[in-house]
């Protein structure tokens, strides 16, 4: 896999967005002509190693769109966007979830998946797991099955894996 390459393209930005936070910036990875493809290929290899065989990919707005579409292309699968409220034109399911300060919501079209679908959730970062769990809850409202979740990076020690206990969770890089 290309994990050393991927990790080398993620910039550490201290004290952003506030003092004491080490922000992991993916823009250098995306700016590299090989960055997105190598990341998607590494994700595909991780899925193969774990025996995860999704039938469709879902990505959470907004960076999950970037990596989700790239991975769907590598896997030869379709892609479904999980959106912020009010962005989808047809009937939707909605899930509200808590953030550090306040709450947010995510939506998905009610007909986004077939009951037989094995959905892979893709996003750039697993931290507390709130957004990922909301995405899982939306998928389960459609009666589809969650095949697994995969992230470019995981911030260890923030409880994301615990929130997603019972699901197959992978991250290419841990910080």
From Swiss-Prot:
InterPro entries documented for this protein: Ade_phspho_trans, PRibTrfase_dom, PRTase-like, UPRTase/APRTase
Q: What is its EC number?
A: 2.4.2.7
Q: Which GO terms describe its molecular function?
A: adenine binding; adenine phosphoribosyltransferase activity; AMP binding
| Location(s), subcellular | Cytoplasm
| Gene Ontology biological process terms, A to Z | adenine salvage; AMP salvage; purine ribonucleoside salvage
Q: In which pathway does it act?
A: Purine metabolism; AMP biosynthesis via salvage pathway; AMP from adenine: step 1/1
**SUPFAM superfamilies hit by this protein:** PRTase-like (SSF53271)
For whether the record's keyword set contains Cytoplasm, the answer is yes
Q: Which GO terms describe its cellular component?
A: cytoplasm
Give the matching Pfam families.
Pribosyltran
- Which family does the entry's similarity section mention? Belongs to the purine/pyrimidine phosphoribosyltransferase family.
The subunit field of the Swiss-Prot or TrEMBL record says: Homodimer.
Name of the molecule in the record: Adenine phosphoribosyltransferase
Organism of provenance: Francisella tularensis subsp. tularensis (strain SCHU S4 / Schu 4)
